[in-house]
Amino acid sequence: MITDIVGYSKLSGDNQDVALELLKEHDKILFDLHDKYNGNILKNRGDGVISAFNSSSDCIRCAVEIQRKLKRRNALNIKERNLNIRIGIHYGEYVKDGNEIHGECINFASILEPLAPHGGIAISEQLADIVDKKNDIYI
């Protein structure tokens, strides 16, 4: 899973205090839900994370709950304080080399992430097929 806060660079340039507040909220939500779904945050990229899960179903459930939680959070805030993220998900093996993470799954998820709408999730067709065959998540 790769996540990215939409518009974070502009926000941090416009109002660094608000940007840091939103980043703290973002981190709390993502870290708590990764714990709940047994996700492992491999790298915190500042305005997003790269993470891995033992189960693709858990990864997708985590992503859905992240977006639901953010949608509820945004409904209670003014537009300028909305926190929207995009999520890209693929599956496969990766290699962690110090602070760097390599692998086709990382590359593909990073291509998918910007294709997701604000507050959305983009998953690869291959992953959708795998999860669909398990019949435990409707995509």
Which residue ranges define each predicted feature?
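Catalytic beta-strand-to-alpha-helix segment of the class III nucleotidyl cyclase homology domain
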Residues: 28-31, 50-139
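Catalytic NTP-binding/metal-coordinating core of nucleotidyl cyclase/transferase enzymes
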Residues: 1-62, 69
